[in-house]
Design a protein with these regions (language model features):
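Conserved Nudix-box catalytic region and its N-terminal flanking loop in Nudix hydrolases
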Residues: 21-62
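Short connector loops at helix/strand junctions that flank enzyme active sites
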Residues: 9-11, 17, 36, 41, ...
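A generic structural micro-feature
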Residues: 6-8, 82-86, 105-108
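Nudix hydrolase/Nudix homology domain
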Residues: 32, 36-37, 105-143
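A short coil-to-beta-strand element that immediately follows conserved catalytic motifs
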Residues: 67-75
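Flexible, glycine-rich phosphate/dinucleotide-binding loops
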Residues: 23, 31-32, 80-82, 120
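Conserved N-terminal beta-strand and adjoining loop/helix that marks the start
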Residues: 1-24, 45
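Active-site-adjacent beta-strand/loop module that shapes the phosphate/pyrophosphate-binding cleft
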Residues: 18-20, 77-101, 134-137
């Protein structure tokens, strides 16, 4: 059975908040991320038939070495991507009391905590500041 779809792209990300800060990452292999070098929320494509919240848990484990955490779906975006494929992005959110110790995977070039009021400028964020837009939507409580 074919499990790769070229018509749709399903992506999950996680906005991880702790101590008034949010975690952003840069990926080592830009080719896997639309040749974007800027900051992202930790993200990945959904595995075949994977639930978006389970994808959030997997992303935290695989990319950041965090286990036992269960991010919750905050909102969904639907749009046509640069490739022409229909993109659905599932934005998960998790608030922690304390910053966890990260064990970053080799896929990440960098993981950095940013104060919520001192986020990087839009030009430094991948996809024209998309992570900033997602965080803004979460802050406004728009779902």
């Amino acid at each position: 059975m074919e499990t790769e779809c070229r018509i749709h792209t399903l992506v999950a990300d996680v906005a991880l908040f702790a101590e008034g800060q949010v975690l952003l990452v840069r990926y080592r292999d830009m080719a896997k991320n639309d040749n974007e070098s800027g900051w992202f929320l930790p993200d990945d494509e959904l595995a075949y038939l994977e639930h978006p919240e389970r994808a959030g848990t997997r992303i935290l484990k695989e990319q950041l070495g965090l286990t036992g955490l269960k991010p919750r779906l905050d909102h969904i975006e639907s749009f046509k991507g640069n490739s022409g494929a229909w993109h659905m992005s599932f934005h998960n959110k998790l608030d922690l009391e304390r910053m966890p110790r990260l064990k970053t995977s080799n896929a990440l070039a960098e993981a950095r905590w940013f104060e919520r009021r001192k986020l990087p400028v839009r030009d430094e964020v991948a996809h024209h500041g998309w992570a900033l837009h997602v965080l803004e939507m979460m802050t406004k409580g728009q779902t």
